[in-house]
A protein has these predicted regions:
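Extracellular/oxidizing-compartment recognition motifs
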Residues: 1-195
Length: 195
């Protein structure tokens, strides 16, 4: 298992909450061209620590252990690296349980890849209104990253953000080129739903 290290100095305030959102990720999400799930394991786990260094170079470590509060009722209702994410903004984590500590017998070592950093922000995409009534935000290139937007609506309204690469022959958005079968009404491929 590889770990990554980030400098979070600028995020530290006088009072802080150490919150971790854990989803399947590479470990147990669907991967590859055959959309196979749980290739590396079934239960995602996490180990984390926050090292606080004061002016005298004294180090205080806050690490994950059995005292961490746990919740399965947050606004993130579904998350898969390939299939996307469902967010229900009516929900809020209650943190009524405590984390289960497990034993890991493998090797934990530093990640030998370049760090994940935000390289650029793509703003003001070209807006395309498709014949079928859908709206496409065209950034003009394939991207890897996250999407940030503001939307207003009444409780229970649903907004779907589906990431893809092309329009079909009729000028409508499609993800059939990246699905194995079916269409995006029944498949969750790269979909983010906000309720």
């Amino acid at each position: 298992v590889h770990y990554q290290t980030y400098d979070v100095t600028e995020m530290i305030q006088s009072e802080n909450t150490f919150t971790i959102e854990l989803a399947d990720g590479f470990y147990s999400s669907k991967t590859g061209c055959f959309n196979k799930a749980k290739v590396f394991g079934y239960e995602p786990k996490i180990i984390a620590q926050l090292e606080l260094v004061n002016e005298k170079d004294d180090i205080e470590i806050v690490g994950t252990d059995g005292s961490f509060l746990w919740s399965n009722d947050s606004e993130i209702r579904y998350a898969d690296m390939k299939d996307g994410e469902t967010v229900d903004s009516r929900m809020s984590a209650t943190y009524t349980g405590t984390a289960r500590v497990t034993e890991y017998q493998g090797i934990i070592c530093a990640d030998n890849n370049v760090p994940v950093i935000e390289k650029e922000q793509l703003i003001n995409p070209r807006v395309v209104h498709c014949p079928d009534g859908n709206t496409v935000l065209d950034f003009g290139q394939n991207i890897a990253g996250y999407v940030e937007f503001t939307v207003t609506g009444a409780p229970g309204h649903k907004v779907s953000l589906i990431c893809g690469e092309k329009l079909d022959d009729n000028g409508n958005f499609t993800i059939k080129n990246i699905l194995l079968s079916g269409d995006y009404d029944t498949q969750r491929m790269q979909r983010e739903e906000f309720i």
